Amino acid sequence: MPHLLVAHPGHELLLHGWISRNKPVVHVLTDASAHSSDARLGRTADLLRDLGARKGAIFGRLSDAEAYAMILERNTPLLLSLVAELAAELEKDQPAIIVGDAAEGYNPVHDLCRLIAGAAIEMAGVATKQYEYAVVNHPHANDSGAIVINLDAVEHAAKMEQARGQAATLTDIDAMLSRHGADAFRTEAIYPIADWTAAGGDEPPLYERYGEERVAAHRYAQVIRRREHMLPLRDALRAAVEKRSCAF
């Protein structure tokens, strides 16, 4: 049984067909409380149950505010506790793969999924392979190693029905359908991650520019930055798993 790690409830819709076919254990980092109380998390739980998937040990563990505070404060103990909890699940289940939100530079909590999943695999000492799927970018993968799921008409219709049914609370749905078109979501792709510690390019990620705009508008107090916040957390995770591996 594979595992899936997503940053926010609602992301599972992007892999609706894959979940329906594979019945994964699904972990959700946040409860999306910044947007709609716990309504989104409840809908995610209902959908997973209907699709035959199972809730993971981490399921809406953090509020959105707590997740962003963890990054801004470089709260390594909290992040390590999440990694350790996921590692325990991986060690118990020995899944062939874990799939997570892609690190696209769009949202730092999305990007955390790569770090948490990769560190958990190493901490657990399992042979689980790490994969990602596009959250914001086009769902078709160009990676030759990608696993591609082509949905049939019934699967695609079920996916679109679920997505449109949640459009009122998931504001990104309409934007994504407008940007990519409904037909783009007939295909789902997960692609392998060779190095979970890869830092990305030199260009500032989109979440930095977005954060700067929000700070200027007095909506945020501080900007989350890759070099100042994300990379120190990555380095702390890498050091922790290396220390653990040296102890055995």
Model-based region annotation:
Residues M1-Q94, G118, E122-A127:
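Active-site rim/loop-helix segments in enzyme catalytic domains that contact anionic ligands
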Residues M1-L4, P77-F248:
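Metal-dependent de-N-acetylase/amidase catalytic core
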